Amino acid sequence: QNFPQLEKFYFNYNVATHDDDDFIFYDCVCDQFISSFWIERQWFVEVAYTRATISIIIKPYRQKWYEFINIDNDDFNVYHSTLLTIRYKPIDEYRQTLLDEIEWILDVATIYHLEISEEDFFIGAIIEIMNLLPDLDSLKLSSITLPTTTLLSIEEREEINFIVYNNEITKVYLEKMNKFDDVLFLIDLFPELKYLQIGCTSDIDINLFLQIILMKINNKTDFNLHLLAISIPTADDSMMKRMQNIIDSKSLLFNYTIKRTYDTIFLRMK
């Protein structure tokens, strides 16, 4: 209203977290930041958690990783753009505090995208966070630590099963795969998955990895994966050709396209 020609706007509102169990943002007015006023102006809202602060960040809208590849041929819905970023890994005794703070944010905002930038984040903690965010469409993880299945309690297994049957996440990006089981677990956890991007190290046996992943996908009924992206520093046209040869020789896919963009090879399944 006062700046009708304003095109770019950056704003960062920080609130220090408290140590008490009854954490409340006494002075925060986040409902003013997470509103249609900003969305209608194509300004992007991000809620970021660090160990000491929670930030409400407003900045010009820019494409995120989940928007560069249009799977459904739909226009991006800016009203579904609110992002929650977690930039620290709470120890077990403070995990509930993080969950309580996320619940507070949900009183004023619906979160559609979640990014966790800390490495080796325990998947059990991720599932607890996801339980609070039923509207999630995308999930970006730095790297994960899996549970030992034999040591899971009945309650933990029930929680995993609940997420499998109730989440609607369609896009997942794992920046660093520690072992093949990381990807296999994510495929099982997200039955609505349409786009999966995996970051691999240069020493990976790409042929073995590709066979294991595609066999896993082929063995799942009603699985909707349309696009598999494999990011690897040594990716080149020769690697892409080897991948194509292994797919064809093993009959892993019949109707697909393969292409490379810089260090990422994209397998689109039709």
Report each predicted region and the residues it spans.
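Eukaryote-biased activation of long, low-complexity terminal tails and linkers
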Residues: 1-270
